[in-house]
Amino acid sequence: MKRKAEKQQATAPVSAFAARKARQQQAQLVEPEKTAQNEPAVEPPSKRARWSPEEGAARQAANGNDRVQTRRSTRRKAETLSSELAEKQPQRSAAAARAQIAERTPAPEKGDAETSDAAEEEEEDILERENGVGVIAAEDDAEGYESPADDVPQVQNFPLSKTRLNKSNIVFSDERTLCVRIKEKMTLVLLGHYDLWVKRGVISLMGAKLHPSPRLYRVYAPSTHSLPVIKCVAGVDGEAEIEVKSCNSGIYRLRHLSPLYQRIWNGKNTAADKLTLKKASASTKRTFSVLYTSSDDSWNRHLRPLHLEKQWSSAIRSLSQRGGRLKVLICGPKASGKSTFSRYLLNHLLSPAPQTENNHRNTDGVAFLDLDPGQPEFSPMGQVYLAHLRSPFFGPPFTHPSLAESQDGSIIRSHHIGVTSPKEDPDHYVLAAMDLMDRYRALLASYPQCPLIINYPGWIFGLGLEVATWLVKSLGLSDVVYMSEKGPAEVVEPLGHAAQEARVPLTTLPSQPTDFVSRSSAQLRSMQVQSYFHMSHPSEIHNPQWLDTTMSRSRPLVVDYAGPRQGIRGIMVMGSQISPDLLHEALDGALVGVVAVESPNAIMGQADTAGFSGSSQRDATQGAEDLSGAASDVDMNDVTDASHGDVAPTSSSSVESMITRTPNEDLPYLFVGSGSCNPLDPKASNCLGLALVRSIDVPSRKLELITPIPGSKLRDALEQGHGIVLVRGMLDNPSWAISEDYYAARAAEKHHQELVAKARKETDTRDGRDAAGDADTQGMVSALLRDRIRRASNVPWMTVIEDNSRRHREAAQREKSLWKLRKKAYPGSESETDW
């Protein structure tokens, strides 16, 4: 009957009204069948693209509107309006449907976060808590700026763990601990931060093979990076036994100070967590969660396991066989996996079996030469350094931004480049790299079996390629690894020629692209620097701790920059020359490198001398007496002028003679050069760390510095007669430090609101007088917290937008989505997305 109806329709009159009426009659016949079968269309598919479900629903609505046209007197006008509506309504309805989906999607996510946070604050403050202003949720990525909508279900349900917890493999569990058995070649993925204890068997974790020992390994697994995979590689009776414990490192507190740290740890309890917490209360939370798939995450984030490609694993095994003779340079394009490969190789070298195949035991540690000032591994941005490491590290760089007072490693020497890319001053960069290499050769005298890993930045084109090939020829390497099989040829060929000339094997490995990155490079740098300033390393414990005290409330280091007790020898501004009148504005609120100058002739191109002497050393001795606050233990009263002798520096070329005092503030402006400032010579200077200039007190000629540099490190530098110079580079502005008070105030207000909501539930058991008194107190506290937020939002250089309209939300959503990066895996890469 349907075919017959279609044939009759084809022979109908061709007038516009007749054709329109025939289509309306056909729609009336088809509509009941559509409703019964719930299908978008019953006719054969046309040449046009297939409708999405929203467009199909909109077209049905449009057809329904067309059927209400009944009056013949206005049939031509109605026919015109209906045809326009039939063409425009599907697009408008589809757009409206998409807009409604985009607005409704974050709603359950926010609700889950608030409910979970309330329960967590009641028990123990160890997990995520929203403070109202955070980064865009991963669920919002379903809009898809580059990826099609069909990829979203796959992204949100990615397999993570092969092991499924049950009664047979759970040894025991309580509110803080989970002990499980993992079969060989099976994996387990955890989200959060925890302490790992290997009790039986051998497991692999981020390149390290961990054997049974009494040691606890601290593991940080945030959602900002691919999650570490715990894999059983050998077991007793085919199983390995591990114990995972909650830890209170304090790093979760940073979410109160920055939205970049929000929603990066575990959320609500997963199904596996509930299975292991049956005997505990419903509000019990651990600092970690067991995930089977990415859909187990209550916040629907894009989670991925950290898997290595087969070629990576074989290359790591081959390189580790060289033992103490290994000196490898790892280079490649940006985002090719250089840091990941370096971290895996480092952990593999630091955790060999008790007796390896080549009878090599790593007792001398591993030297790590980091030449990437933009994304360093063990220091804040803007530095290149040589580190001596003795234990594996499990976590992204912002979980170990410094090795000061660490038992797992130390910084041998560091140089402040002052930029995130070495292309700004390649000469200074190369000299710093060569000086660090000389320090490694000196380290071999004490640790002859210490291998070397060199991490080169993604600056591999143009002048960066020339620097890379020169390093290959000059550093005496044993291996070169290039992290890309796709070239380009103009990079691989010169690199291969340089390796061939130096008689060094060149290994080419496939890059490991990431499907989703939730933080941009600039945001990761901000997280790392903020972690650097809030981290402390108490001597009583093995692992570091983080505090959520804002920078404005931290105790500063007060030092004189002029007068008889001068502690700062000079202030250098890298890059183009600025007027001395602008030095105050350039320095106030900036990040500066604290550099110890080992010679008065420390400017690039000058002769080296033994050290500061005469009046310079006496000034340094007196200047140390005014160091107070965070480094109050620094005292130079025991240092005498005779400790280093009297070696008269050359007045025409010494640092002291190159200082110009600013006319208004009397700041010691150190500038040498023509047009741009010559940097300090790496052979005569050493960077101690970073500091934030909180204020400049002009009447008293003092600087207030916030710095995590240990006081013992400053004292040692001053006792050796070194002068302290502050170097103002071209690093990212510390906007995170300006907004910390605002986010802390918001977090305090939300915490108070949660306590008030909890107290209201308990008012039924009290009399009315007590309830009224509590309400008055709560109202006063709320008013004080609102005033605190108001004052924190009025600081300079920051604008708080309170507009919560739909237009503002959409604009903010588009702006935050700009840094959501996607990199597709190419066919044959064997990466996790090439399935």
From Swiss-Prot:
Start and end residues of each stretch annotated as Disordered: 1-132, 608-658, 758-777
Disulfide bonds: none
Keyword Transcription regulation attributed: no
Acidic residues: bias regions: 114-127
Record-level GO cellular component terms: nucleolus
Subcellular location field: Nucleus, Nucleolus
Major enzyme class: transferase
Keywords: ATP-binding, Kinase, Nucleotide-binding, Nucleus, rRNA processing, Transferase
Positions with biased composition (Polar residues): 649-658
Any one GO molecular function term: ATP binding
Alphabetical list of InterPro entries matching this protein: Clp1/Grc3, CLP1_P, P-loop_NTPase
A GO biological-process term: rRNA processing
Comp. bias regions, Low complexity: 91-105
Major location category of this protein: nucleus
EC number(s) stated in the UniProt entry for this protein: 2.7.1.-
Residues annotated for ATP binding in this entry: G332, P333, K334, A335, S336, G337, K338, S339
Basic and acidic residues compositional bias, start-end: 758-772
Pfam families tied to this protein: CLP1_P
Keyword Kinase: yes
Family of this protein: Belongs to the Clp1 family. NOL9/GRC3 subfamily.
General function of this protein: Polynucleotide 5'-kinase involved in rRNA processing.
This protein's name: Polynucleotide 5'-hydroxyl-kinase grc3
Gene: grc3
